[in-house]
Amino acid sequence: MQNIDQQELDKFEKMAKSWWDPQGDFKPIHQLNPLRLSYIAQQANGLTGKKVLDVGCGGGILSESMAKQGAIVTGIDMSSAPLQVARKHALESGLHIDYQQITIEEFLQNQTALFAERGEDEKFDVITCMEMLEHVPDPSSIIACCKQLLKPNGVIFFSTINRTLKAWALVIIGAEYVLKMLPKGTHDYDKFIKPAELLHWCDEAQLTCLDMVGYHYNPLTGKFWLNKDVSANYMASFRIQS
């Protein structure tokens, strides 16, 4: 059984055409992307020449920005329409990004033989999985696969939403209904993930947390910022336990 939720895929299929419209359904991601790109590059000690896997890449906003910083990017997703948008936009942007419609579990299976033949160098220096864990039935499986695809000294990044009343008020009521930053029904509160749950799954996968930050939005300025408050949206970086 594939680790996908068809209803979740359908949501993003419907929104695919507006993926690269900075004023469309994905406006918050366009606004957030420079901040998260900077965080990823800082935590990973730069992206130039590094092999990067973007899990749940969607229409390619993060994938393209990492490629522009010199990363060798592979993006995987199970939504066909967003991937078509991603491929077209990368072509128009003159970027080579390997986009594949595949689950991470299947991708890992395909890569395992390559690792056995060519060694650890075929693994990834950086893996990103942003705003994706809260949209799948089994987040722990995604995390375990990411670990197996990572080089020994690589860095993994996860971002998701805390399961708190504050997150419900800000992300669902505020962003979807009041500010209309996101289409209604984009998020399901029951699928939000507490930091303790993320840390537990990562520990099971033998990953250790390097850093965890919350990111916050000011609707008056349209700007995001980072701090240590992880009561709503947050992201974290991990390495393989030594």
From Swiss-Prot:
GO terms for biological process: methylation. One of its GO terms (molecular function) is 2-polyprenyl-6-hydroxyphenol methylase activity. It holds the Pfam family Methyltransf_23. The keyword S-adenosyl-L-methionine applies. Pathway: Cofactor biosynthesis; ubiquinone biosynthesis. CDD domains: AdoMet_MTases. S-adenosyl-L-methionine binds at R36, G56, D77, M130. The keyword Methyltransferase applies. Keywords: Methyltransferase, S-adenosyl-L-methionine, Transferase, Ubiquinone biosynthesis. Gene3D superfamilies: Vaccinia Virus protein VP39. Its EC number is 2.1.1.222, 2.1.1.64. It catalyses: a 3-demethylubiquinol + S-adenosyl-L-methionine = a ubiquinol + S-adenosyl-L-homocysteine + H(+); a 3-(all-trans-polyprenyl)benzene-1,2-diol + S-adenosyl-L-methionine = a 2-methoxy-6-(all-trans-polyprenyl)phenol + S-adenosyl-L-homocysteine + H(+). Belongs to the methyltransferase superfamily. UbiG/COQ3 family. O-methyltransferase that catalyzes the 2 O-methylation steps in the ubiquinone biosynthetic pathway. This is Ubiquinone biosynthesis O-methyltransferase. The lineage of its organism: Bacteria, Pseudomonadati, Pseudomonadota, Gammaproteobacteria, Pasteurellales. The gene is ubiG.
